[in-house]
From Swiss-Prot:
InterPro entries: RNA_methyltr_RlmE, RNA_MeTrfase_FtsJ_dom, rRNA-MeTfrase_E, rRNA_MeTfrase_SPB1-like_C, rRNA_MeTfrase_Spb1_DUF3381, SAM-dependent_MTases_sf, SPB1-like. Residues 505-532, 622-634 have a biased composition (Acidic residues). This is AdoMet-dependent rRNA methyltransferase SPB1. One of its GO terms (molecular function) is rRNA (uridine-2'-O-)-methyltransferase activity. Required for proper assembly of pre-ribosomal particles during the biogenesis of the 60S ribosomal subunit. One of its GO terms (biological process) is maturation of 5.8S rRNA from tricistronic rRNA transcript (SSU-rRNA, 5.8S rRNA, LSU-rRNA).
Length: 833
C-alpha cells in the first residue's frame, strides 16, 4: 500500500478558520479577519454602499463585502494578479501604485465616493525582514493615497501593516487624515504573524492636502538620532536602558578610560560620566598636584573614580562637586569682565516720551488681556448653555461692570469703616484725605503701575462671578436633590431670636433721619448707579437697625397673649429692687399657672395682693371674664404641646447622650447654656462670600462626646425599626385581620338571629351556633404529602406501588431527586432572607 499523502501544515495555517472557510465557501481564511473587524467596529460594512478592496486576490474580502453590504452596492476589487469573477463584484487586474489603476477606478466610480476602502496586501517576503517591512509600509502608504482620493467624508479605511520601525510614522499620518485611529489584531490572525490591522474611521477630507504627507521619501525619511541622554544614566543609574539601536561602528569595546584632569576641564561632564568606566589619575600632572590638596579629594572619591559603572546618584553628585571646587581653585570658571557701556543720560523730552511709550504699552496689554478674558468667559458660557448646564448670567455681569468706574463707591466706604458714620450723619458724603489713604481702592497713586489697578478690578469681577456660580450651583442641586431642598426650607423657616422691646420713639427718629438723608441725597448732583446702590444699602442698614429693636416672631406670639395687653411698652431705665421682686412674682405666678391652673378665686386674691406694687400686671379694661379666656388658652396651648411632643424623636447618638445626661442629673439647664458659648458662637461672618460661609458651617461646630449606652440605645432603636415588616407584608396582615373581623361580625349577626328565634330550643340554638363557629375556625386543607421513591435497587423497573409506601408517591431517579432537594433548599434559603 502506498503512503497516505498529507497536506503540509505551514506555520499552523490549517487551523479551524481554514476549515470554516472551506465550509462557508470563502476563498481564504483571511475572510474571518474582516468579519471580526467589522463586528468589533460597529458593522461599518452593513452601512457601506460603495466598497473598494485593494490587493483583493484571491477575493475573500470581496465575498464578505458582497454578503454584508446592502443590496445593489458597488464593490470593486483590484489586484496585480488575476482573480476569478464573483457575483455582484467588479474585479480588474492592475498595480495600485500606477496611474492606470487610478484611472480605471475613476471610470468605475464615475461621480461616486467610496464609503469603505479595504487593503490586505503584502509584498513577496523572504529576502530580509527590514526590506520586507519597508516594502509593506510603502504599499500601505500607496493604498492610503488611493483611499484619500476616493473616500467620502466620514469614510472608513482598513489596512494591514507589519510591526516595524515605520509603524509610528504611518500611525501619525493616519491621525492627520482620520478622527479615530485604532490598531487591532483579530483572533483569526495567527499569533506568530507580525501583521496587525489599523482601522481608521471618520475621514476628515481636507480641502488642501500637503503632498509631503503621502510621499514615501518624506514619511520614511531617516532622521538623525538626537544626543544621547546621559543625565538619565547618571542621575538614575538604577534604571538600565538597552541599546536597541546597536553599538556605534568601529567601537567594539565595552570598557573606556580617560584622565581625571580631562574630565575636570571638559565642558560636558555628564556625558563623560555616562560613557567612561574609569578616570585615571596622572601623578605627574601639575594641575593634579594643586587640586590634590582639596578637602574634597578623599579616599572615597579616589575609590569612586576607579569604577564609575557601579556608582549611585549620591556618588555622582560627589564627583561633580569635586569638579566644581577644582575648577574654582584653578580659575577655570571665572567670567571675563565685560567692558562697561557708558549710558548717555536722556533728555527731559526723551524721558517723557519713553515713559509715555511704556504707559501706552501697559495700557495696550491690559486691554488685550481684558478682551481675551471676556472672550474666554463668553465661550465658556456658550458651551454651558449648549449643554443646558446653567442659565445665561452675562447680562447681570455686564450690568455690574457699568458702575465700576464711579466717583463714589459704598463698598469702598464699608472697607474704610466710615459706613457707620455715614448712617449716623445726615449730610456727610465726602471722605477726608486721611480716610481716603486707608484703602488702596480709593487712594490711587499716580506713580502706581496700571497692573495693580487691574488686579483690583479683576478681584471684584472674580468675586461677583464666584457668587453667581455658587447661586447657580445651589439652584441645580436643589432641582435634583430633595434633601437639599428640605434643608433650605428648614433654614428659611427658622425664626429670629428676640432682641428686646421695640422703641417707637427711636424708630420714628431713625425714619426721620433716613428721610432727611435721602432727601438731601436726591438734591445732590451724584446720580450715578453706585449712588443708588449706596442709598439702597444705607436704607437697608437703617431698616435692619429698626428690625433689631423689634420683636421676633416667637416674641410677638408670646406677648400677643391677653395677659400682656395692659403692660406699658416703655420700661424704666433703672428699676429698683421692689420692681424686680414683683416681676419675679409675676414670672413665678405664670409658671404655676402653666403647671397647675388655679381657680378664679385664688387668681383674684393673688392679683389683689399685688396691688401695692408699682408694676401693673394686667389692666382689665374689658368686661369679659379673663379667667375663662386664660384657661381656654392654656388648654389649647397644652394640647398643642402634647401634639408636638409626639413629633419629637431622638434620632442621633449625641441627642440620646444629652437626654441620658439630663435624665440622670449629670447636666442641668445652666450647663447647656454654658456649652452654648464656645469659639464658634461669635465668629465674624460679615463681608464673607456665601459659599465660604456655607462650607464653614460644616466645620464650625463642636464634636460632642457620646457614650456607649447612648450608642447601644440608638442601635436597638434602629434594630427595632428594621425589624418591622415591609409595607407590603403589613398591608397583607391588615387585610387578613380585616377579613377576620368582618367574618366575626357576620357570625355575630347570624348568632343573634338564631338566638332570637323562639321556635327553636336552646339545644338546637347551641348546635347551630357551634356549627357556625366550626365553619369560621376550620383550618385550610393541607395538600397531601407526596412520597418520593427512587427507582433504583429493588424498585428498579417496578410496576405498581412499592412496598411500605402509603398515600401518594412519585417514582424518580437519583438525578431528579437531587434536583428536587436542591430546589427546596434554595427556596428555603430565600424564604429565610
Amino acid at each position: 500500500m502506498g503512503k497516505k499523502t498529507q497536506k503540509k501544515n505551514s506555520k499552523g495555517r490549517l487551523d479551524k478558520y481554514y476549515y470554516l472557510a472551506k465550509e462557508k465557501g470563502y476563498r481564504a481564511r483571511s475572510s474571518f479577519k474582516i468579519i471580526q473587524i467589522n463586528e468589533k467596529y460597529g458593522h461599518f460594512l452593513e452601512k457601506s454602499k460603495v466598497v473598494i478592496d485593494l490587493c483583493a486576490a484571491p477575493g475573500s474580502w470581496c465575498q464578505v463585502a458582497s454578503n454584508l453590504c446592502p443590496v445593489n452596492s458597488l464593490i470593486i476589487g483590484v489586484d496585480i494578479v488575476p482573480m476569478k469573477t464573483m457575483p455582484n463584484v467588479i474585479t480588474f487586474q492592475s498595480d495600485i501604485t500606477t496611474e492606470d489603476c487610478r484611472s480605471k477606478l475613476r471610470g468605475y466610480m464615475k461621480t461616486w465616493k467610496a464609503d469603505t476602502v479595504l487593503h490586505d496586501g503584502a509584498p513577496n517576503v523572504g529576502l530580509s525582514w527590514a526590506q520586507d517591512a519597508f516594502t509593506q509600509s510603502h504599499l500601505t502608504l500607496q493604498a492610503l493615497k488611493l483611499a484619500v482620493e476616493n473616500l467620502v467624508v466620514g469614510g472608513t479605511f482598513v489596512t494591514k501593516i507589519f510591526r516595524s520601525k515605520d509603524y509610528n510614522k504611518l500611525i501619525w499620518v493616519f491621525q492627520q487624515l482620520f478622527e479615530k485611529v485604532e490598531a487591532t489584531k483579530p483572533p483569526a490572525s495567527r499569533n506568530v504573524s507580525a501583521e496587525i490591522f489599523v482601522v481608521c474611521k471618520n475621514f476628515k477630507a481636507p480641502k488642501k492636502l500637503d503632498p509631503r504627507l503621502l510621499d514615501p521619501k518624506e514619511v520614511f525619511e531617516e532622521l538623525p538620532d538626537g544626543p544621547q541622554n546621559m543625565e538619565a544614566k547618571v542621575f538614575n543609574p538604577e534604571k538600565k536602558v538597552r541599546k536597541r539601536g546597536g553599538y556605534e561602528e568601529g567601537d567594539y569595546l565595552l570598557y573606556h578610560e580617560t584622565g581625571l584632569m580631562d574630565f575636570m576641564k571638559s565642558e560636558d561632564p555628564i556625558t563623560m560620566l555616562g560613557e567612561y568606566n574609569k578616570f585615571i589619575v596622572d601623578e605627574e600632572d601639575h594641575d593634579w598636584k594643586i587640586v590634590k590638596k582639596l578637602k574634597q579629594t578623599t579616599k572615597e572619591f579616589l575609590a569612586c573614580i576607579e569604577d564609575l559603572k557601579v556608582l549611585g546618584r549620591k556618588d555622582f553628585k560627589m564627583i561633580l562637586k569635586w569638579r566644581k571646587a577644582a575648577r574654582e581653585l584653578l580659575g577655570l570658571d571665572e567670567e571675563e569682565e565685560k567692558p562697561e557701556i557708558e549710558e548717555t543720560p536722556l533728555t527731559e523730552e526723551e524721558q517723557i516720551e519713553k515713559e509715555l511709550n511704556t504707559l501706552q504699552e501697559k495700557q495696550r496689554l491690559s486691554v488685550k488681556r481684558e478682551k481675551r478674558k471676556k472672550n474666554e468667559m463668553k465661550q465658556k458660557e456658550i458651551v454651558r448653555m449648549q449643554l443646558n448646564m446653567i442659565n445665561p448670567v452675562d447680562i447681570g455681569i455686564e450690568a455690574a461692570e457699568l458702575g465700576r468706574e464711579s466717583i463714589f463707591n459704598l463698598k469702598t466706604a464699608e472697607k474704610t469703616g466710615i459706613l457707620d458714620k455715614l448712617a449716623k450723619g445726615k449730610r456727610r458724603m465726602i471722605f477726608d484725605q486721611n480716610e481716603l489713604a486707608i484703602d488702596n481702592d480709593i487712594h490711587i497713586d499716580e506713580n502706581a503701575p496700571l497692573d495693580d489697578r487691574d488686579e483690583l478690578a479683576e478681584a471684584d469681577e472674580l468675586e461677583s462671578q464666584l457668587d453667581a456660580m455658587y447661586s447657580n450651583y445651589k439652584e441645580r442641586k436643589s432641582e435634583r436633590d430633595a434633601k437639599f431642598r428640605a434643608k433650605q426650607a428648614r433654614e428659611s423657616s427658622e425664626a429670629d431670636n428676640w432682641n428686646g422691646f421695640e422703641d417707637k420713639q427711636s424708630d420714628e427718629e431713625n425714619e426721620e433721619e433716613t428721610k432727611d438723608y435721602v432727601d438731601d441725597d436726591d438734591n445732590s448732583d451724584l446720580s450715578d448707579s453706585d449712588d443708588d446702590e449706596a442709598i439702597n444699602q444705607l436704607i437697608a442698614k437703617l431698616k435692619s437697625r429698626e428690625n433689631s429693636s423689634k420683636l421676633s416672631s416667637k416674641a410677638r406670639a408670646l406677648f400677643s397673649d391677653s395677659l400682656f395687653e395692659g403692660v406699658e411698652p416703655d420700661l424704666p431705665g433703672k428699676a429698683d429692687l421692689a420692681d424686680s421682686e414683683s416681676v419675679g412674682d409675676v414670672k413665678q405666678l405664670t409658671k404655676k399657672r402653666k403647671l397647675n391652673p388655679l381657680p378664679a378665686e385664688q387668681i383674684s386674691e393673688a392679683e389683689s395682693s399685688d396691688e401695692d406694687s408699682d408694676f401693673e400686671i394686667v389692666a382689665n379694661n374689658e368686661d369679659g371674664d379673663v379667667d375663662s379666656e386664660y384657661d381656654s388658652e392654656e388648654e389649647a396651648k397644652r394640647t398643642k404641646q402634647e401634639k408636638h411632643s409626639k413629633d419629637i424623636d431622638i434620632a442621633t447618638v449625641e441627642a440620646m447622650t444629652l437626654a441620658h445626661q439630663l435624665a440622670l442629673g449629670h447636666k442641668t439647664k445652666h450647663d447647656l447654656i454654658e456649652e452654648g458659648f464656645n469659639r464658634y458662637s461669635f465668629r465674624d461672618m460679615e463681608n464673607l462670600p456665601e459659599w465660604f460661609v456655607e462650607e464653614e458651617k460644616q466645620h464650625s461646630k463642636i464634636n460632642k462626646p457620646i457614650t456607649k449606652e447612648a450608642a447601644m440605645a440608638i442601635k436597638d432603636k434602629l434594630k427595632a425599626l428594621n425589624a418591622r415588616p415591609i409595607k407590603k407584608v403589613a398591608e397583607a396582615k391588615a387585610r387578613k385581620k380585616h377579613r377576620a373581623v368582618a367574618r366575626l361580625e357576620k357570625l355575630k349577626k347570624k348568632a343573634g338571629l338564631i338566638n332570637d328565634d323562639s321556635d327553636k330550643s336552646e339545644k338546637d340554638k347551641a348546635e347551630e351556633i357551634a356549627k357556625l363557629m366550626r365553619k369560621v375556625t376550620k383550618k385550610a386543607k393541607q395538600k397531601p404529602k407526596v412520597t418520593v421513591v427512587v427507582a433504583s435497587g429493588k424498585n428498579r423497573g417496578l410496576s405498581g406501588r412499592p412496598k411500605g409506601v402509603k398515600g401518594k408517591y412519585k417514582m424518580v431517579d437519583g438525578v431528579l431527586k437531587n434536583e428536587q432537594r436542591a430546589l427546596k433548599r434554595i427556596a428555603k434559603k430565600h424564604h429565610k432572607k
